Swiss-Prot record:
Family matches, as PROSITE patterns: UBIQUITIN_1 (PS00299), UBIQUITIN_2 (PS50053)
Protein name as it appears in the record: Polyubiquitin-A
Domain Ubiquitin-like: 1-76, 77-152, 153-228, 229-304, 305-380, 381-456, 457-532, 533-608, 609-684, 685-760, 761-836
Gene Ontology cellular component annotations, sorted alphabetically: cytoplasm; nucleus
Summary of the function given for this chain in its UniProt record: Ubiquitin exists either covalently attached to another protein, or free (unanchored). When covalently bound, it is conjugated to target proteins via an isopeptide bond either as a monomer (monoubiquitin), a polymer linked via different Lys residues of the ubiquitin (polyubiquitin chains) or a linear polymer linked via the initiator Met of the ubiquitin (linear polyubiquitin chains). Polyubiquitin chains, when attached to a target protein, have different functions depending on the Lys residue of the ubiquitin that is linked: Lys-48-linked is involved in protein degradation via the proteasome.
Record has Methyltransferase as a keyword: no
Other observations noted: In C.elegans ubiquitin is encoded by 2 different genes. ubq-2 gene codes for a single copy of ubiquitin fused to the ribosomal proteins eL40. ubq-1 gene codes for a polyubiquitin precursor with exact head to tail repeats.
Keywords: Cytoplasm, Isopeptide bond, Nucleus, Repeat, Ubl conjugation
Gene this chain is encoded by: ubq-1
Amino acid sequence: MQIFVKTLTGKTITLEVEASDTIENVKAKIQDKEGIPPDQQRLIFAGKQLEDGRTLSDYNIQKESTLHLVLRLRGGMQIFVKTLTGKTITLEVEASDTIENVKAKIQDKEGIPPDQQRLIFAGKQLEDGRTLSDYNIQKESTLHLVLRLRGGMQIFVKTLTGKTITLEVEASDTIENVKAKIQDKEGIPPDQQRLIFAGKQLEDGRTLSDYNIQKESTLHLVLRLRGGMQIFVKTLTGKTITLEVEASDTIENVKAKIQDKEGIPPDQQRLIFAGKQLEDGRTLSDYNIQKESTLHLVLRLRGGMQIFVKTLTGKTITLEVEASDTIENVKAKIQDKEGIPPDQQRLIFAGKQLEDGRTLSDYNIQKESTLHLVLRLRGGMQIFVKTLIGKTITLEVEASDTIENVKAKIQDKEGIPPDQQRLIFAGKQLEDGRTLSDYNIQKESTLHLVLRLRGGMQIFVKTLTGKTITLEVEASDTIENVKAKIQDKEGIPPDQQRLIFAGKQLEDGRTLSDYNIQKESTLHLVLRLRGGMQIFVKTLTGKTITLEVEASDTIENVKAKIQDKEGIPPDQQRLIFAGKQLEDGRTLSDYNIQKESTLHLVLRLRGGMQIFVKTLTGKTITLEVEASDTIENVKAKIQDKEGIPPDQQRLIFAGKQLEDGRTLSDYNIQKESTLHLVLRLRGGMQIFVKTLTGKTITLEVEASDTIENVKAKIQDKEGIPPDQQRLIFAGKQLEDGRTLSDYNIQKESTLHLVLRLRGGMQIFVKTLTGKTITLEVEASDTIENVKAKIQDKEGIPPDQQRLIFAGKQLEDGRTLSDYNIQKESTLHLVLRLRGGDI
């Protein structure tokens, strides 16, 4: 039979094998084809490293299966593993080792079975099938080992044939783990399994607890039939595309396949079948789409149009829509803006009530048309109840209803017994005997429903004095509840308590399970000193808001206070201090924000924009970003999509390498711009740096290192500050922002180091408007360097600058001393208008 072997570079090799071949035989065939010695090959299948002495059939590897080939880098490295008892274990590993391999090494040393081990790094639980390099674990990193207490829980998996399988799992198991357990029991490859719970298809990377799957829950197993079927997609130009699909594929999957074939981003695709627009989350079988069915592809034109919606109060809302949007879509947009549930909205145009399933173009609604919004009034009022799985329930209630009554209504709708319900509003747990009006719950308020897990557990709270308190809690308890229990035991008011777990401050409205706090976990209690402080928040409209805060408040807490005062949702807020965007998880003291400091509030406009990232393999990734995102944020989004660690990414735009701390708008990157992604190759090379005294320094570098990085390495070795270093190669002065590969500097190349004498000089640059700029320069600076300094001061790109001195236009590669430009000389700056000069 044939199998495929995929390398990390994306290359796929085809091998002729037999099911009885050993892994050793397969590696020999790879050596014959690719020249890679077997001892440098590691083969992975279904997230598991394959052992030499086993056969393909031992691993249920069938025809057209794909193995993954990872190369062992010679040499390896040491890492440390710290247990909860404080013991530290040293392991010899390679960056390409999987977490599973690491657990096996721990078992060899400590005798702990892998299925009882949980490894934590940088606060994240590590998954068996991933490698150390996937998590950027480097030499001498420390992992933390937490033991899984035996027991977990049992769940059931029911197949379409009616057979029920029992599995031993833990709430923290991923769906991928569950599929692997099903494979172990039933031999069904994970890629042929679809798991359904509460009517929802479960995603591989999520955990059982993400879906609120509890002990003795039943999942449904649907098999993906191999081979699937063909369908056709017809475009408006008449072109027909053939796709290989399965009836269980979602519309989202189909759009991704169309993107692979045609390069059309999914958000620009609308698929129509039997006159109906298909929704992303539904499957082909939901729409009864069978083999050789034809779908119609309509492109969403970017930009669409604006329409207005006028309410009975006279308020006018502006919406971005497309003529192909359904009335249902429009109501959803109104809900996003105004919070009015679609079932309370009636839309009127030209005296006619609009029906949900029709489109704007069906009613001839064009740009800048005005719709009228009429609310359906109910008796009493409506409130919403949001569950942990994200489902929202609508209830008809009255302000005088007790919490007990509300729980009974939830039982009627959802079948959840009242004694398993906990209702939370404004971060507070609601008591049965109180009424909605006691808690100031008004129409369209949203309550949060948390289920009580039967049984509870004990946790410990350690104070700074060393005292340890034991608390009886449930995983669904909020941090606020925990603080109340501490107050009951110790008399410390909740507003003076700060609880820390895994180095993170815990927020009142979150639950213990949100932070993965399990039985016998230890929290740390730190007391807040009374008093706090005031800070100011200035908006773009010039309004200043005063907030009462503490230095230990997180940015997330501050945004919540702004929401309380101004009604602006936190996800639309960006806070700036000292020119820096503040991150949610950090505290005010992390940024040295003191009393009476002023923060600046910038609103994120909903929707942001799309940009494209093109890799060297030609693959194009689509990202949702905002102009205010930093390059660091963008690299994190690429990591989320592609798994490439940020420190291996170099992003290029307009020929320039982008710096982590700058934003997209700093580089004038706009919607639908394309960035280029270049990978930093690990391993690097040696170069030499020769000083004027004749001394030669050896440096370990990578071709992707910037000149700035190289100067930092020289500073580490020789103590010379980067701003006093000038590096020369092939007679050319090297610029900080460029890379070694930009200058074709290869292994064992020699750079020359010239020192800048301190002091330099000042020159003046006069613009046509009469403005004079002062620059700090040196006689050895090139004209290119000078233009870069002008860009830093004035924001004018170098390619739009022409510099004149003594009636002569200055050339980029020459230095100031070449033109005899001395201290306090005046240059003249003329701007090049695109397409010609002025």
